């Protein structure tokens, strides 16, 4: 029986991603002044409007409107004909201070006075597989690459580009009997574009400029299906056509549907929120275990209680691909990794302004960025323990 897997990504100018980028841009500006700030910022974008709300406790002063409009400008919403532009949007700031009760629960963990407690209860997941050099599914890797290429081509064309900021991409991969990628079965790409372009010309240019440079030729055959702007012309996009909200692209942000998701989003949250820091650390653990050869793919689930440092549970799933006993993997995890929030923050150095760069094209598998949770710096330690 044939096995297929599909993942999607969205462009930097997708409404939900605009919201994520604004939230993380604000977070980064706050962290530049106050590394100990507590943040849980949410953003909505719609026709002519940006609303920023949530909780923030900090000594920093940040001009939220300026950060929001500068972010929108950098994304590419500049031309008046786009409807939603950096210099015309109404920005409302409804941020309030974090609850004192939550703050006191986090400041000192109930079970470990030297640690901070988890910022909330939550279930988080980390995942890695070895089918790509980035340790993420091939379908997701290619979907992100298509969206990066869309941005590159649009920005290279500057004001003469036929592309506009919004877009979506999707790749389907067929697997062989060895559970390795065999071929690309389908590609879907929808790109916002200028008015006045002919549909067939648009499709030909997207095929040549965006798709061809990204797809591995050895995985494309005569039966690969391409759906380029399958709904037809798409000149009206972005928040002018569709509202956006932080945290609404959590599968794009993580593993493209290959792993479970606990439901917590990332953008706008500081590292005391285990939705973010715990998920980053779980990815770090899974990636190092797979890179060390303990399994071909691995998922880890971690459960937290608010105000408590140590996880209430840790569970592993290797999907039958383990190369050593599951008990041995658990033992290595226990010896090498510390899932307490403050330990995670210190080990990965998460009180820095590094988050805006993650708010588009995925938080994991980012070989184009120097992200601490993507480092393979525990592999040799894991291998040494394996040898004992």
UniProtKB/Swiss-Prot annotation:
One of its GO terms (molecular function) is methionine adenosyltransferase activity. Its cofactor is Mg(2+); K(+). It is found in: Cytoplasm. L-methionine binds at residues 55, 98, 242, 273. ATP binds at residues 14, 166-168, 242, 248-249, 265, 269. Belongs to the AdoMet synthase family. This is S-adenosylmethionine synthase.
